[in-house]
Amino acid sequence: MTPKLKLNNNINWTKRTIDSLFDLKKGEMLEKELITPEGKYEYFNGGVKNSGRTDKFNTFKNTISVIVGGSCGYVRLADKNFFCGQSNCTLNLLDPLELDLKFAYYALKSQQERIEALAFGTTIQNIRISDLKELEIPFTSNKNEQHAIANTLSVFDERLENLASLIEINRKLRDEYAHKLFSLDEAFLSHWKLEALQSQMHEITLGEIFNFKSGKYLKSEERLEEGKFPYYGAGIDNTGFVAEPNTEKDTISIISNGYSLGNIRYHEIPWFNGTGSIALEPMNNEIYVPFFYCALKYLQKDIKERMKSDDSPFLSLKLAGEIKVPYVKSFQLQRKAGKIVFLLDQKLDQYKKELSSLTVIRDTLLKKLFPDMTERTKSIKDY
């Protein structure tokens, strides 16, 4: 449950320069030979994710840092000791009694877009430390209010971190199970009592078991922002909704062109098959669609690589129909085997949706708590 904020709206909020609250120090260069995959500490430089690992650190945990070269403006609060690279800048509190660390982090995070706007350069962007020092951020001297804001936002971040971990664990488990299932790993089949697959599984083309349908063009203005039936085109996620679907539920789609060419999707509700997508509808009721969805997801990387090697990458209905997938005639075996991987895939999708939804809520709340000073009194009453 999200804690209810009890903020004093009459507290005098002000703007303070970053330089008046923090001691800023630019990171150090790390020699390439000191970067090792087995290193004890993360090495953060110009990217949002770590740039590798190393066996030494130069910054203690619970330190705020801002990227000043590369992915400029990204604000991070480290929970472990790390090596701060030269494209990073650390911000240490000048007076911990005046400013709560997590409140300081969220105050900076709320201004991340403004920090990003300080960047200059065409190829590799940079932020001048002098410009960063002069940037003003929202500040209140009331420690109770600082703690209330920090604690509330921390609840969201802890859940987001937990979800990210669950997503990674479930993705690895799903991929491992799919590999063992479709490569007919003897120990795996024995554990799940699927030994019959050893003799019954063989390859078949998609065109022998599915009907194919090209996506239909639909103007963006004809799509709805909200609705019951999602519109899927050449993007992995839906890009709007429609009043009437053109494809049934329990179907598969393959993205046929664009950046996400070859990506596989499963549809558990009726949907609109748009431009850049190919719908796969089972020919009969003896096909357990999730089994073939899992098989295609297992083959997805190979499919994408084959398509990208073409001078003009495009997946036609003919080529889609020629894709070979593992097949077993028994519907019961399809169902029993497919469910093992499919349930993990559904759980993974559930975690991803929760992560996306919670991120939007957290970011909205962050902006509500740290808006422009002229707007704060009005908007904070919503919470």
UniProtKB/Swiss-Prot annotation:
Spell out the Pfam families in the cross-references: Methylase_S (PF01420)
Enumerate the residue ranges of region (TRD1).
1-142
**Gene knockout outcome:** Not essential, it can be deleted.
Coiled-coil stretches, from where to where?
A: 143-182, 331-370
**What GO terms are given for molecular function?**
DNA binding
Q: Where is this region: Conserved region 2?
A: 331-370
Q: Where is this region: Conserved region 1?
A: 143-182
Instruction: Note the Gene3D superfamilies from the entry.
Output: Bipartite methylase S protein (1.10.287.1120), DNA methylase specificity domains (3.90.220.20)
Cite a single GO BP annotation. Answer: DNA restriction-modification system
Name the keywords, alphabetized. Coiled coil, DNA-binding, Restriction system
Q: What ranges does the record give for the region TRD2, renumbered to this chain?
A: 183-330
The record's similarity note reads: Belongs to the type-I restriction system S methylase family.
Record note on domains? Contains two target DNA recognition domains (TRD), each specifying recognition of one of the two defined components of the target sequence. The TDRs show high structural similarity and each forms a globular structure. The two TDRs are separated by 2 long, conserved antiparallel helices that form a coiled coil structure.
Known role: The specificity (S) subunit of a type I restriction enzyme; this subunit dictates DNA sequence specificity. This bacterium does not encode the associated endonuclease or methylase subunits.
The name under which this protein is listed is: Putative type I specificity subunit S.MgeORF438P
> What organism is listed for this UniProt entry?
Mycoplasma genitalium (strain ATCC 33530 / DSM 19775 / NCTC 10195 / G37) (Mycoplasmoides genitalium)
